[in-house]
Amino acid sequence: MDTGCLSSMNITGASQTRSFAGQLPPQRCFASSHYTSFAVKKLVSRNKGRRSHRRHPALQVVCKDFPRPPLESTINYLEAGQLSSFFRNSERPSKPLQVVVAGAGLAGLSTAKYLADAGHKPILLEARDVLGGKVAAWKDEDGDWYETGLHIFFGAYPNIQNLFGELRIEDRLQWKEHSMIFAMPNKPGEFSRFDFPETLPAPINGIWAILRNNEMLTWPEKVKFAIGLLPAMVGGQPYVEAQDGLTVSEWMKKQGVPDRVNDEVFIAMSKALNFINPDELSMQCILIALNRFLQEKHGSKMAFLDGNPPERLCMPIVDHIRSRGGEVRLNSRIKKIELNPDGTVKHFALSDGTQITGDAYVCATPVDIFKLLVPQEWSEITYFKKLEKLVGVPVINVHIWFDRKLNNTYDHLLFSRSSLLSVYADMSVTCKEYYDPNRSMLELVFAPADEWIGRSDTEIIDATMEELAKLFPDEIAADQSKAKILKYHIVKTPRSVYKTVPNCEPCRPLQRSPIEGFYLAGDYTKQKYLASMEGAVLSGKLCAQSIVQDYSRLALRSQKSLQSGEVPVPS
């Protein structure tokens, strides 16, 4: 996982730039599209010499959260639990495999965790000085956290829910009311809700929520929408997979779904799911999400993590790995995959000159980074060649600290339905660690971001404030004549999750590569949850499962290599 640069501006206006993790010179901040950039601004000069808005006392929060839903009896949860038990119950290896895993995002952490559960020794290497990959976060000089993205944990994420249970940290998820709340662009400051009744089973609760909402779709539009979805309901998974070749917009025209359904529903869904608009997104992505949300009673119920992901989610996984003999190393950037004469992996060469060897190797980096690492000798192999179609989508995450508490918000995720913004939340309300009774901190996903990723931080903030003035007409003005900005952070990710455009599905690789002893993990690899945190965790489990299943072959290969003297002593 590569890093970018931290740019800052002091209150006198002097611009400063430095390498964020000490691994890239400033001039290389945007040399390649996979570098993530960070921007930090502090705007109020009167705060010079003291904390910008608050101190951090011992955490005391009156919890408004809802009880954890009963997920344990759902089929998907049980299947995910069965896969977890595969590792715990597998035969203990006579000689544990040493598996080198590159990338400590959720996919790499998951791979290492389940390999350790099976009795093997993972060596997890992270390029940056922070865990989490796409869920990474950083603490500023005031002690406030800012994140790579706005992360939501759904009830329909069975592998993540199992993972929280296995780590005994289920209480770190703050469950919210079972609703979806959309801003009304034509009625500034107003919202429309889809409330899922707790007393009804799926899919009736979802249908009820849609039918009860008369502010976004008319009855004729609802009927035509339902008729358009009938083939998916009847055809099941084969039908869903067959729609991979169509964009959402193309599917709507084919099914006779009114354009207003796109304007009122699908634009918001597309941007929330993949940070792009319906004229680009594969309809398969929408149908998979609808299937998960409608087929499981609590599938669309949302939870926030109670604090920053590196400490509250990633560190418990690291502790688990280390407690079972595994290793996790930060600041360990993969420079090159060195090969043996037969085309298999000899070792991972790090940027500091270190060579890391193992019995098996996993690349759990984002697809764009892995494509830069693919050895020339592998480039014409179909498995690797097909990856060219998989490209990360740009996204920008914006955090704004205001000088007051905003009233026109909820303790929930909100769909902005803005042309520039996707979803947002007042994190001072939704998250325990970020709780503040006096001032709001809005975290917003700025998407689609293709045209904005290279623009200045000032331009992005100005555009964001214009949109917020529509969402908070009585409280926010673009010129800050109402609520004042205390400070803000902008995190740019030029290449985030893979862009789920039509005809990508055949290009997604299995976790087991055609190169003996080499594997892939990441949400772009083949698994049923597409580009998501759930997909990343599941990909790691499937990768670890492939390695455990290949144990005999890998152990024999390692033994022969040692006897022939081809493999050096592990570093």
Curated annotation (Swiss-Prot):
Chief localisation class: plastid
What InterPro entries does this protein map onto? Amino_oxidase, FAD/NAD-bd_sf, Phytoene_desaturase, Zeta_carotene_desat/Oxidored
- Where is this protein localized, as stated in its record? Plastid, Chloroplast; Plastid, Chromoplast; Membrane
Known EC number: 1.3.5.5
Q: Which GO terms describe its cellular component?
A: chloroplast; chromoplast; membrane
Cofactor names from the entry are: FAD
Annotated FAD binding lies at: A107, E126, A127, K134, H151, I152, Y157, I334, D523, M533
From the UniProt record, give one GO term of the biological process aspect. Answer: protein homotetramerization
Catalyses: 2 a plastoquinone + 15-cis-phytoene = 9,9',15-tri-cis-zeta-carotene + 2 a plastoquinol
Give the record's pathway.
Carotenoid biosynthesis; lycopene biosynthesis
Gene Ontology MF: a single term:
phytoene dehydrogenase activity
Cite the entry's keywords alphabetically.
Carotenoid biosynthesis, Chloroplast, Chromoplast, FAD, Flavoprotein, Membrane, Oxidoreductase, Plastid, Transit peptide
What domain of life does the native source organism fall in? Eukaryota
Give the residue range annotated as the organelle targeting sequence.
1-96
Q: How does it sit in the membrane?
A: Peripheral membrane protein
Binding site residues for substrate: R292, A531
Quaternary structure annotation from Swiss-Prot or TrEMBL: Homotetramer.
Q: Which family does it belong to?
A: Belongs to the carotenoid/retinoid oxidoreductase family.
Q: What is this protein's name?
A: 15-cis-phytoene desaturase, chloroplastic/chromoplastic
Please spell out the taxonomic lineage of the organism that makes this protein: Eukaryota, Viridiplantae, Streptophyta, Embryophyta, Tracheophyta
